Structures are given as structure tokens and as C-alpha cells.
Amino acid sequence: MTPGRILCALTAFLVGLGGAVAQEPKERPHVQKSQQAQAKVEREAEEMLAAVVRVRMKAIPNARSNTNLGPSREGTGVVIDGRGHIVTIGYIVIEADSIEITTQDDRTVPATLIGYDHASGFGLLRSGAPLGVKPMPMGQAADLAAREPVMILPAGGREAASLAYVVSKRKFAASWEYLLETAIFTAPPTMQWAGAALVSREGKLVGIGSLLVRETQEGELQVPGNMFVPIDLLKPILADLIEKGRRSGPARPWLGLATEELHGHLLVTRVSPDGPADKAGVRNGDIVVGVGADPVKSHEELYRKVWGLGAAGIEVPLKIVQGADVREFKLRSIDRFQYFREKPVY
């Protein structure tokens, strides 16, 4: 069965239209083969659904992320191996006090956050009890092409599943010191995007849901949809996350400020309390115009200049318009892991 046929059959099954799968032609031997193929796809679809779990998290009481993300969070996770490892989007589980996952057959078991990667945004959990489900195989997000059909699987079973298509694959620079060289943008949007599985025509995991976006493509035509983090970014760091909780190598410098691109300027919209920018005196409403002698006009320019200075701990010289003055600020960057709080161990 071709990849396109697989997705067609999966779509029909997951949305409750199993009988609508084309049965060609009508001679009895072919009908029997078609029924056997459909039964096989339905079994595979059930296994695929079983690998998608609901993630519920309660944050530690003094979590810094509670202000923006709330003390209780919920989303989706995907079982990726036989050892109970579950990948999700990290903002659901950062600064967790407790995490539980619920399977498709309504079993609820505890889970532990064992790895987090700020650069990609992935969070990695480990189930506290055997799940007895077949892991979802990881595919190649790099092979996805524009207009290719995909399936979005949030927690909630077949009723929550939806068919989408790839609108674009392109660079994504966010306001919170986050940059992906290639993100996957899909449409139409799902409202259950957080941690949702993006599944290819081959029935493999190719992305994890991150955001609802107004623009899935560049240009004047706005097409709302979702942004997915490519699963390809997890593969080279998975062993590190399992063994050490984070990727190997020097940490990027983090400043603790969010900016908005506005008419060729970077307007400061949020300063993380007690972060490097806050300690240096940067305030909401300031405008970042340069890193040292180099001008910056976009998120990408800012991040590349800052990250290019060295590892976390490096002093970052920012040129900032504050009020009517252009001032030079020196920010002592930190490893972002230092800022977020961990669950106390007694």
C-alpha cells in the first residue's frame, strides 16, 4: 500500500469513516484483499493512537513559569520507545512538581521529567509504570514537502484527530530567545496543538506541536495554522536527554528578555524578573538597537549576535534606547537552566 493510500485509510478510520475507504475493484478476491488491507491499517491506526497520551502537570508553587504558563498545564505526549520515554513540548512540563499521563484506555500513571532542551523546546518524560503500548516510530521531517498531507494526533482519541497539510517549512524566530532553523507549519489549525503528534503519510512521527500561529507562510496572504518542532531535532540529543537531562556542549547565553519586531526595531515587551536583563536595568518599552557595535533589527539578528559571543556566562553588550537616551548595557548572561527552579528534594 502506497504512503498516500496509508494516510487515506488512516484518515477514514480515525474520523470514523472506515467503510468509506475505497474498495477497488469489486471482484470478490480483490474485495477480500481490500478488506484485509483495511483491517491491517485499522490495527496500525489503533496502535498509533495508543502511543499518544494525555499529559497533566502541576508546577512547583514558586515556579517562575507560572506567570505566563499557569500552575496547572495539560497537553499531549508521544511514546517513542519501549522504555516508557515520552516526548512532549517542553513548556507543558517545565518546573514540574508532579506529572501524570493518561493512556487511550483511561489508565493514569505518574511520570517524571527526565530531560529538557531549551534550544529545540522538547521535554522528555519517563513513565512510572509499564504502558504496554507500541511506540510510535520516528520518521524524517526533512522529507516533508509543501502541500503534503499529514495527520495531527492530540490526546483524545480518534475524535480529536485531524487531517492537515504542510503549508511551509521555514525558519522560526520567536520573541523569547528561541530560533529554529526549520520549523513545520501546517493548516488548517488544531486547537489542541500543545505536544500533539504530527504524523507523516508513512504513519511515522515527524513533529511535536508547539504553537497556534496566524501566519503559516511568508507574504501578504495570512493562513492560520500550527507550528510543529521537527522530530529530527530530537534524534541527535535523545541519548543526552535520557542520560544527562540536557544536551551536551556549552549552553547558549540567555538574557531573560522578550522582544517584538516593530517597524525594523526590537521593542522589549517582557523582562524576566531577576534575570540578566532585569538586573542590568533593562525595562519594558526599551528598544534594542545593537549588540556591541553591530546593529540588530530582527529576532534572528539579535540571537545570532548574542549566541555568537560565546557560551552562557559571557558578558553581552547591548545598545538600547531607553526613554530619550541611547545607552550601553552590559548583561552578564546565564545558562537558562539556572533561571528555572527545580522541584525540591528532601
For the regions a language model picked out, list residue spans one by one.
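Active-site-proximal beta-strands of protease catalytic cores
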Residues: 52-54, 86-89, 146-156, 186, ...
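Flexible, gly/ser-rich surface segments that form the specificity/activation loops bordering the active-site cleft
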Residues: 70, 92, 134-181, 214-219, ...
